[in-house]
Amino acid sequence: MVKYFLGQSVLRSSWDQVFAAFWQRYPNPYSKHVLTEDIVHREVTSDQKLLSRRLLTKTNRMPRWAERLFPANVAHSVYILEDSIVDPQNQTMTTFTWNINHARLMVVEERCVYRVNSDNSGWTEIRREAWVSSSLFGVSRAVQEFGLARFKSNVTKTMKGFEYILAKLQGEAPPKTLVETAKEAKEKAKETALAATEKAKDLASKAATKKQQQQQQFV
């Protein structure tokens, strides 16, 4: 059995902008699991299509139950090959990605097609398909379930990373990460607490002064 995923996403940016952002996605605050990226091949075909192959290195933290099945020295990084075909005339970009190590444990294959959104020519739609398989006897189903859940989580990070880079390229303020938002909220709460403490001290001081004045009136 192979786990299959199909998803549709929309980026509110033109195809040209998304195409430019695609090659500048890393690094971004949502791609900390992406360690390296290298272009290993690139060519322009006779029909003016751009073909590229990239090698990416990503962290591959295993679930705890899987760590018990493998030696401690098993690499925690996964190598990904990404082939892409860019057709500027028809404004489409198709990417194929798959892992080239840990293949016995799990293989994740992904196909994405980027094209102009049918409802808004200024937007870009992404059709994403993925196939997750495992050849491990006895635990392949659990591995595939884990792989599919991890893939969905990474898709969310990918889209947030895209939006972050697109905002930077378009001169807008990039959307804040949850860490940045939490940090700001913490700082604001600290400032509010400090202001409340100072106000309480001021009120207490005024109350003490007033009480002292009242006592002096009766002396």
UniProtKB/Swiss-Prot annotation:
For this UniProt entry, what is the primary localization, expressed as one broad class?
mitochondrion
GO MF annotations in UniProt? phosphatidic acid transfer activity
Catalyzed reactions per annotation: a 1,2-diacyl-sn-glycero-3-phosphate(in) = a 1,2-diacyl-sn-glycero-3-phosphate(out)
Q: Which InterPro entries match?
A: PRELI/MSF1_dom (IPR006797), Slowmo/Ups (IPR037365)
- Domain PRELI/MSF1 stretches: 36-174
Q: Which Gene Ontology BP terms does the record give? A: apoptotic process; negative regulation of apoptotic process; negative regulation of mitochondrial membrane potential; negative regulation of release of cytochrome c from mitochondria; phospholipid transport; positive regulation of cellular respiration; positive regulation of endopeptidase activity; positive regulation of phospholipid transport
Which keywords, in A-to-Z order, does the entry hold? Apoptosis, Lipid transport, Mitochondrion, Transit peptide, Transport
- What is its subcellular localisation? Mitochondrion; Mitochondrion intermembrane space
* GO (cellular component) term, any one: protein-containing complex
What's one Pfam family the UniProt record gives for this protein?
PRELI
Assembly and binders = Forms a complex with TRIAP1 in the mitochondrion intermembrane space. Interacts with OPA1 and AIFM1.
Q: What does this protein do?
A: Involved in the modulation of the mitochondrial apoptotic pathway by ensuring the accumulation of cardiolipin (CL) in mitochondrial membranes. In vitro, the TRIAP1:PRELID1 complex mediates the transfer of phosphatidic acid (PA) between liposomes and probably functions as a PA transporter across the mitochondrion intermembrane space to provide PA for CL synthesis in the inner membrane. Regulates the mitochondrial apoptotic pathway in primary Th cells. Regulates Th cell differentiation by down-regulating STAT6 thereby reducing IL-4-induced Th2 cell number.
This protein is called what?
PRELI domain-containing protein 1, mitochondrial
| Upper classification of the organism | Eukaryota, Metazoa, Chordata, Craniata, Vertebrata
